[in-house]
Amino acid sequence: MRHSIRLTAALLLAFIACFSFPLSAMALEGEYIAIRKEGAGRIALVLGKPLAEGGKASAWSAELDREIREGLAFTGIFNMIPPPLNLFETGGSGKRTLNFGALNSIGAEIFAGGSLASEAGRVKLSMAVYETFGAKPILSKTYSGRPDELRTIAHAFCADLVKLLTGRRSVFGSNIVFVSNRSGFKEIYSCAFDGGSLSQLTRSRSISLTPALSPDGTRLAFTDYTSGRPGLKIMNMADRRISAVRQSGVSIDPGWRSNGEVATTLSFEGDQDIYLVRPDGTLSRKVTSSRGIDLSPSFSPDGTKMAFVSARFGNPQVFILDLGTGQTRRLTYNGNYNTQPSWSPGGDKIAYTTMEKNGEINIFTIRPDGSGATRLTSGARENESPSWSPGGDMIVFTSGRQGQKKLYVMNANGDNQRRLLQMEGEQMQPSWSFIP
């Protein structure tokens, strides 16, 4: 129930009323945005457990606290530190207030806390966030929903906090689609950003590969082998109906352009080149032409350029095509084998897979002008298939570091690598986006 959550500005947080915090009676997001630069250290955060106002709210408090903590920890941008013993102090009037001196003494940059109540059978979570050095309130907001939506309520607050502190769209509410052979067939599955809410999308009992979510998350393009040869299919994510995009020859490895067109590799003219296909399945135009196979299209956010893989000079390398001028230039030169480009949502980097001279397969990022090639993974087997989070602050990828191929996530700079979900079989070829 993503759409049933109600977010409203808090006039006066019950949490604040309990402890007499100095906060004006208004939501304050927008008055304070501390943009966290890429590569900066983690934000030191003290998180107070939501104070339950008795009754049903007491039963919800522990679960909401856990969901908020796990959600914020997943982002990799927070250093969660325990609160000081003297978190509150009592003034001359006998009122309890936040002890900002104590928070500063333990290195806390941000404090977040709130109250929890039951109102007409619904959960009401009121949260307040402070920048501790200046004792400045930076966010006041109330979130409400049904009791079975505690996870979504918690993530709504997490999303607001991350947006406030980084200026970027967060991962909360986003989804990852991927391929798994858990059932004995290669089918496409989806899960929440943190590996929860696992769902099987295709049931072809055949081979489904290279899933690609559209930028708005409403459609899923993938390669399907049900007919015996690879063909392009598109799933409507609202009702999960699947339609075939019928073209003669082979159709593989789709990628979405911002205008709704799908780029895919077709072979009906002999060579395997990349074509643009309209939403109705008709051909728009051919965009690459070479003797070697061209595949793995990934577009810049504005849709004017396309990164792709070509073996036109021998080994596969990543190229960039300007769709306006038709000019193509080679992007990658490190390693003997460069594939699977994924253009970042901000447009400033492209992640890709490299086979290095020592035989290791690792993930790199590079700027679109060819500078700044940076290795993100190392010392592990078969790191491949990178896909950016919608905000560009994380990457999901496939790794065989524990034997079978599994999904992992990491920060955009390669930090905080960890396995995404526990699931039987192998998981591969992830694509990350929001699904309405």
UniProtKB/Swiss-Prot annotation:
Its main location: periplasm. Pfam families: PD40. GO terms for cellular component: periplasmic space. The keyword Signal applies. It comes from the Bacteria. It is found in: Periplasm. Gene3D superfamilies: TolB, C-terminal domain, TolB, N-terminal domain. The keyword Signal applies. Coiled coil: none annotated. Residues 1-27 form the signal peptide. InterPro entries: 6-blade_b-propeller_TolB-like, PD40. Keywords: Periplasm, Signal. Belongs to the TolB family. PANTHER family: PROTEIN TOLB, PROTEIN TOLB HOMOLOG. This is Protein TolB homolog. It comes from Chlorobium luteolum (strain DSM 273 / BCRC 81028 / 2530) (Pelodictyon luteolum). The lineage of its organism: Bacteria, Pseudomonadati, Chlorobiota, Chlorobiia, Chlorobiales.
